[in-house]
UniProtKB/Swiss-Prot annotation:
TM region(s), chain numbering: 25-45
PANTHER family in the record: ER-BOUND OXYGENASE MPAB_MPAB'_RUBBER OXYGENASE CATALYTIC DOMAIN-CONTAINING PROTEIN, PTHR36124
Organism: Penicillium roqueforti (strain FM164)
The encoding gene: mpaB
EC number: 1.-.-.-
Protein name: ER-bound oxygenase mpaB
Catalysed conversion reaction: 4-farnesyl-3,5-dihydroxy-6-methylphthalide + AH2 + 2 O2 = (4E,8E)-10-(4,6-dihydroxy-7-methyl-3-oxo-1,3-dihydro-2-benzofuran-5-yl)-4,8-dimethyldeca-4,8-dienoate + acetone + A + H2O + H(+)
Length: 298
């Protein structure tokens, strides 16, 4: 046989192939076409919104992301949170708040002030926090509603900060979790991780919100020299928050008390017969450090 030819290129092969396909049922040809088209269609539709976002907010390089404004960051984060991954953003935010109760200085203050000492006050505290954060993340940074929610939050914190009952590091840690947890949850549980554009938007937005709330990032390695972009801040605050947990997320009875009250809030709409399942799921979502700090069994 010549080097340039084989059975697969001969007329007899073409005739054989046609004969095989001609004898196949029509549904089989349709199924083969569907199997080929389906992944292409899924790829096109799944990434359609991300491609539109990257076209609308054109930051082609990491260097160009340094010019991202707070308003652009807000719009990018809003589209991603409300249209692309709405369920995971909500759950990540809830878990971020829950995770702060693993730090004794935070849980002690909540119990001491009565905010998490009984169901009535724990529901109010959770609702107030959700409302304020919702106003901040769902409205433009230049809007009246965002201004009022920031001002209200600063007022609520001011007395505790003046008396030293709220630590600046605890505030930065809480801010870090609200920025980092959605990124981590989506990377772990969704069909794709966030893009650099989306991560930069989240970092830019929460760094700016922290500044507005009077939460300093100076303790971070680049805090005094400045951050290149939102991704730079996000990565540094993520690393810092993990190191903070190693030092300060330790077992404490009031961590457990705060966690129990928070869990009761989260399971409120679930029928009581399913509460044990909800508790097991909550425990499953915890890593070993958080589980030990809250005195939950493995």
């Amino acid at each position: 046989m010549d080097k340039g030819t084989s059975f697969f290129t001969t007329p007899s092969f073409s005739a054989t192939t046609r004969a095989i396909f001609n004898t196949m049922p029509q549904w089989f040809s349709f199924a083969v076409g569907l199997l080929i088209a389906y992944p292409l269609l899924i790829n096109s539709l799944r990434y359609r919104r991300l491609k539109q976002l990257q076209k609308k907010f054109y930051f082609p390089t990491r260097e160009s992301m340094a010019k991202m404004t707070d308003e652009e960051a807000f719009q990018i984060q809003k589209e991603t949170a409300q249209l692309e991954f709405p369920f995971m953003f909500v759950k990540a935010g809830q878990f971020a708040l829950f995770r702060t109760y693993g730090i004794p200085t935070i849980s002690h203050l909540l119990i001491k002030t009565g905010q998490f000492s009984k169901p009535e006050t724990s529901f109010k505290r959770y609702t107030d926090t959700a409302a304020l954060i919702g106003e901040m993340v769902e409205n433009s940074p230049t809007s009246q509603r965002a201004f009022l929610s920031v001002a209200r939050t600063r007022f609520l914190h001011s007395g505790y900060q003046a008396s030293g009952k709220i630590l600046d590091t605890d505030l930065l840690y809480t801010l870090a979790l609200f920025a980092v947890q959605p990124v981590n949850f989506i990377a772990a549980f969704e069909w794709r991780p966030l893009s650099d554009l989306e991560r930069c938007a989240i970092g830019t937005f929460w760094k700016s919100l922290g500044d507005a709330l009077g939460i300093s990032s100076d303790i971070l390695p680049s805090g005094k020299t400045g951050f290149r972009d939102g991704i730079h801040w996000l990565e540094e605050v993520d690393t810092w928050s993990q190191e903070y947990e190693v030092k300060y997320m330790v077992p404490d009875a009031q961590n457990r008390e705060s966690a129990d009250q928070a869990t009761a809030v989260l399971l409120y709409n679930l029928p009581k017969v399913f509460h044990p399942v909800g508790l097991q799921f909550t425990s499953f979502m915890m890593d070993d450090r958080l589980r030990k700090a809250m005195l939950y069994v493995e």
